[in-house]
UniProtKB/Swiss-Prot annotation:
Protein's gene: aspS
Positions marked as site (Important for tRNA non-discrimination): 33
Protein location: Cytoplasm
CDD domains listed in its UniProt record: AspRS_core, EcAspRS_like_N
Keywords, alphabetical: Aminoacyl-tRNA synthetase, ATP-binding, Cytoplasm, Ligase, Nucleotide-binding, Protein biosynthesis
SUPFAM superfamilies assigned: Class II aaRS and biotin synthetases, GAD domain-like, Nucleic acid-binding proteins
Protein name: Aspartate--tRNA(Asp/Asn) ligase
Documented EC number(s): 6.1.1.23
A Gene Ontology cellular-component term: cytoplasm
Family, as annotated: Belongs to the class-II aminoacyl-tRNA synthetase family. Type 1 subfamily.
Amino acid sequence: MHAFRSHTCAELNKSHVGETVRLSGWVHRVRDHGGLLFIDLRDHYGVTQVMADPDSPVFAEIEKVRSEWCIRIDGEVKARDESLVNAKIPTGEIEVFIRDIEVLGKSEELPLMVFGEQEYPEETRLRYRYLDLRREKMQRNMVLRSNMIRSIRNRMWDQGFNEYQTPIITASSPEGARDFLVPSRLHPGKFYALPQAPQQFKQLMMVSGFDKYFQIAPCFRDEDPRADRSPTDFYQLDMEMSFVTQQDVFDTIAPVIAGVFEEFGQGRKVDAPNEWPQISYKDAALWYGSDKPDLRNPIKMQVVSEHFRGSGFAIFAKLLEQEGTEIRAIPAPTGGSRKFCDRMNAFAQKEGLPGMGYIFWREGADGMEAAGPLAKNIGPERTEAIRQQLGLGVGDAAFFLGGKPKTFEAVAGRARNVIGEELNLTDKDRFAFAWIVDFPIYEKDEETGKIDFEHNPFSMPQGGMDALNGDPLDVRGNQYDLACNGYELVSGAIRNHKPEIMFKAFEIAGYGKEEVEKRFGGMVNAFQYGAPPHGGCAAGIDRMVMLLADEANIREVIMFPMNQRAEDLMMAAPSEPMSEQLMELGLRVIPQDD
């Protein structure tokens, strides 16, 4: 017999009755039933009930066992009485009578319980992550992650992609976030950087003649944490292809993403990839107040400025006299009560706005009537025109925000999400995907008038050089994101592979040729030797697992995550270096004032 186990703790059933077996695992819980000791023995695969009575030669040793001790037992498999069968677990028809026991590892008093559903502070969970990971939900999440990555690899290989690895130590190349710098011992005063993404390397692969690349790539960014973002590192499905159009990239990655969500989505609806809408960045902001809209929510915002221009509602009427302003409506089907409207108005105030105007429609003495402060101020004719435009009726409401879109759009988008949630309009059993396209490359600083990059400067401008010779604010990039349920899941672009167009694109934003060559010299030089048209994208592994596991926090699907302050409480990182290390690197730490 094997030194530690003949079977796992999920393997035994009635067919093993009468056999002598060996199991190893952790004591999930201990129960004393009138002198009989029952232990739920747990390993990675499941739980088996083992037991001993006072006549057992090792009963005294078994009495000493406590939760989360690691033990090995030998015993005989016996069938449970019919009334004691536990149909919820694979081993529920049997139990093992212990004949021998060995304690493989004792446990101190537990700072958090593995058994049960009790919640613990995140600080405790991360400090004792090895205990937290023993819990069933966490084991399930990590196995899901492993299986999902395996499925992704298989799907990419099936499409003719090859997996190649890119460097983990490279040059600093600002890509929208801060770099993690690594000092060089051999070159004092100089630094490497951990890559924010394999972006330049994968493009250089295309220049090198490789046609289809992918990688499950680690990425390192010194970012502020969010619930859906790790503050230090994350993994992405990174891919690139030569001689492709934007639609080719969509047709390649969409079946991979859809297939993974169908395989691991536990029956939730996944729209067919050919049904995923392509929404312009401009329309996404207009309709949903976000470039990563949650399309499970059917609410679509609309511009209703004309109904308020010159109206009796002075706030909006005067606002519309200013250049670049508009009034936007958020329809709220079934939200037609004053209580709900007041609640949403309070939401807007918490978001930093003065409030949110509203109208709701109800049954009156003479039929349907509009109610709310706005309805009184603008009159029945304008109110009716708004209702008809929005397609609303009795029991419905509409909320209104105004100003320059950039000042209220994000809040409007969040309000749309809250309305969808509170009115049960958002379909929880669906993964709703949408391609966001036609991103503007440039934006103008309203105070300085300076033109700068708004989005990826390395995407090929739609229209090429001709577009760059026109109004920069009209230039759209061959850039795209894939949104799912309110999260950005994929981001990519058709790349700018022509040096002269790249130099021109950066020149518009105030970057000279020398600066571009200094910062991106490796890639720019390579493009002078016959670079092919190429494009690709990257999909966030952590976010995909988070959605599939139905978790709200990304740390629930990362094995050993940092906390919100970018600290590893378990490994005590970051830590102060030893003086010898600093001397070897030629570095000195300058004390910071508190």
